[in-house]
Amino acid sequence: MTRLAIGKPAPLGAHYDGQGVNFTLFSAHAERVELCVFDANGQEHRYDLPGHSGDIWHGYLPDARPGLRYGYRVHGPWQPAEGHRFNPAKLLIDPCARQIEGEFKDNPLLHAGHNEPDYRDNAAIAPKCVVVVDHYDWEDDAPPRTPWGSTIIYEAHVKGLTYLHPEIPVEIRGTYKALGHPVMINYLKQLGITALELLPVAQFASEPRLQRMGLSNYWGYNPVAMFALHPAYACSPETALHEFRDAIKALHKAGIEVILDIVLNHSAELDLDGPLFSLRGIDNRSYYWIREDGDYHNWTGCGNTLNLSHPAVVDYACACLRYWVETCHVDGFRFDLAAVMGRTPEFRQDAPLFTAIQNCPVLSQVKLIAEPWDIALGGYQVGNFPPLFAEWNDHFRDAARRFWLHYDLPLGAFAGRFAASSDVFKRNGRLPSAAINLVTAHDGFTLRDCVCFNHKHNEANGEENRDGTNNNYSNNHGKEGLGGSLDLVERRRDSIHALLTTLLLSQGTPMLLAGDEHGHSQHGNNNAYCQDNQLTWLDWSQASSGLTAFTAALIHLRKRIPALVENRWWEEGDGNVRWLNRYAQPLSTDEWQNGPKQLQILLSDRFLIAINATLEVTEIVLPAGEWHAIPPFAGEDNPVITAVWQGPAHGLCVFQR
């Protein structure tokens, strides 16, 4: 058998140099590593990696070419109590593989064993890594680098966004290619979006439990190969990377950034009864947080937690992030359950991964957004991330819903959230843009469902409606479900308008959930992670054009208001904001805490948001000057020029003078 040359210990992964392929793999506790190469007939050829530099195993295979299929068998101790679960009978995926061939099916051969090792060989059915070559013409592509103060984020699912779009060619609907289609780009531009945030596109697997129920992991928060694109979103798996980069290049030409939702907190190997794909068999003790009994710390709710304080795992995470920036030109990341990134195991702002990102000349220059919590003790860290990060602002979400749908939030609390939650984020030199304001997200009710359902309806998920949060702050306006009388429909519409206006005209960075501007409903399912069907796909034929136009007008109005785009904290007397009561007078201390839900917010001394969140029609006396109701509020209900606004119940209007 041909012996491998020693090769080089860097970079990690499999890299073709024109003459052959260099293979590298980290494992601090392995005793031997075999590279397994598969020919066109599926015949396996094994080679010991001869190089061992520190904890990096490496070797060079001359004459190997792109398209080569490979995997690893890693030898070492089976000592579960010590956290070691080596099993060379199982073929393992390279954590840095750029392409995977094969499916991650629910198969007992893809398990290593719980207390005792399963020595049945699984190479015949295990997915294989594929060596790829990186040639792509980016032409004159350049990142838009939209200032944070001008950023409008649109959270979308690659498939769900375009799968039912009638104006996109059938053969590319639901794919990376569709993201770059002129129809999609023109829509995003007309809406006013500056950043498209995609749910996970790194290759993921469906949990065995879901597969047994005939379901699949739709959202993608179950990663198995962090450097590989999910092939199901490609027209052809072999060209996935090319298609993805084509889409990014087209979006960049239109001035739209691309932000990836990335999962660095756990892997698809789940708990100890979960499948064995890669990390568990390569170096379980290093990659995961291990308890004293050898089991996993489950700080993610997914069975395991990546140890992002381990130097090698930090290097792996940074290499992954740099890959997406340098190879795919993405403009930033949203980090799922990002508190895990700072665990040492306690959360620290100077945790190793945070420090590495801060010191990286590539990663420190892109947009970084944290979902600032995990499920463990001390996991709620909203406002505590390092200055480079923006954070999902759940304070804003809950306050907006409580104010408009539950009517139980004082004006002072509402104003605090409207002003970028300065009590939470104004620290360590951070700017208002650090607050990623949202009313809805992929996780939870859609905006329409917020006004149509009091209770979640997740029966289709197969967990007897136990999954998903019960804390929704929603209001069905008197009838559970969609449809209803004209009066009911109008009241729900008014609430949607109020929530959208609050989101898009408040200080901070707004994030809009794709489909909310259409009136998309998931029929009360607030945890549709496993629903790859018409429940989650956006139905463009049923989209509300009026609501879409309303949303677009709000976004374009936002861009005209200096107080919202200059990204400076509002200070008393700086002309950015004045808070007034229904008589155009400054609010008293008592009104802030106990007053009626009526408020006027004067922005940049020229734009006025008049709010009547009470149950009664109320006269709102506008400040001195000639005020014009402006789109999307100008119309028969709001006089073109007025000094007094007849504020409808649960209504609001925006004026300019």
Curated annotation (Swiss-Prot):
Name of the protein in question: Glycogen debranching enzyme
Primary role: Removes maltotriose and maltotetraose chains that are attached by 1,6-alpha-linkage to the limit dextrin main chain, generating a debranched limit dextrin.
Stored PANTHER family: GLYCOGEN DEBRANCHING ENZYME
Enzyme class: hydrolase
UniProt keyword Endoplasmic reticulum, yes or no: no
Pfam family, one: Alpha-amylase
Region annotation Disordered: where it falls in the sequence: 458-479
Keywords noted in UniProt: Carbohydrate metabolism, Glycogen metabolism, Glycosidase, Hydrolase
EC number(s) per entry: 3.2.1.196
Family: Belongs to the glycosyl hydrolase 13 family.
